[in-house]
């Protein structure tokens, strides 16, 4: 999830931020879904706005509407807390963010193993999870992105099979998602994660 959050922050969000723009991040976030936004805010002059917790120790999504302004650009929120195991009302949070034209990044590291999010029904722009939280190997995970969002993203890393052609005058990249797979892929990790997902499906 850390790599995924950073890739979304740097490759999709950063080129679209201007000084004074706002990134709303819930107070319940693991720093994997906080630090990338603090970094991109520092780089662009944007600012991170904290979505506070409610009395139940979950993000107060009912208060989100009051935080959204014409400068709000991104909502970063976790599917499930890594501390309490509590789950915010994602549907309500996303509806408010999407109504304001915001991009939504959901950290699914904790929740994916328990109840995978329906990314299309919830209208999630980006959703990330880690392999080891699904009984798979470490060092592997996945990032979902809407096809139109991925098509608008520039590559974060370069080299390997993410290009179709390269000369000293320039290069051409593969279409998404392959242009985000620079270098030799984690082949063993992919096989291990695939086996873990198959096991989860069989035992569900």
Predicted regions mapped to residue ranges:
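Pyridoxal 5′-phosphate
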Residues: 3-204
């Amino acid at each position: 999830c850390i790599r995924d959050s950073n890739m979304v922050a740097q490759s999709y969000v950063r080129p679209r931020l201007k000084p004074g723009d706002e990134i709303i991040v819930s107070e319940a976030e693991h720093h994997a879904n906080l630090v990338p936004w603090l970094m991109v805010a520092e780089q662009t002059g944007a600012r991170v706005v904290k979505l506070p917790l409610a009395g139940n120790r979950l993000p107060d999504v009912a208060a989100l509407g009051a935080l959204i302004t014409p400068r709000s650009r991104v909502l970063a929120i976790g599917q499930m807390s890594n501390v309490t195991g509590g789950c915010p009302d994602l549907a309500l949070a996303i509806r408010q963010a999407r109504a304001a034209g915001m991009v939504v990044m959901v950290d699914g590291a904790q929740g994916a193993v328990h109840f995978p999010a329906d990314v299309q029904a919830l209208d999630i722009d980006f959703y990330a999870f880690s392999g080891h939280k699904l009984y798979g190997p470490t060092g592997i995970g996945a990032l979902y992105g809407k096809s139109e969002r991925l098509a608008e993203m520039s590559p974060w890393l370069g080299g390997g099979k993410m290009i179709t052609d390269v000369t000293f005058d320039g290069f051409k990249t593969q279409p998404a998602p392959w242009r985000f797979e620079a270098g030799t892929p984690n082949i063993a990790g992919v096989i291990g994660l695939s086996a873990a997902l198959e096991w989860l499906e069989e035992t569900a």
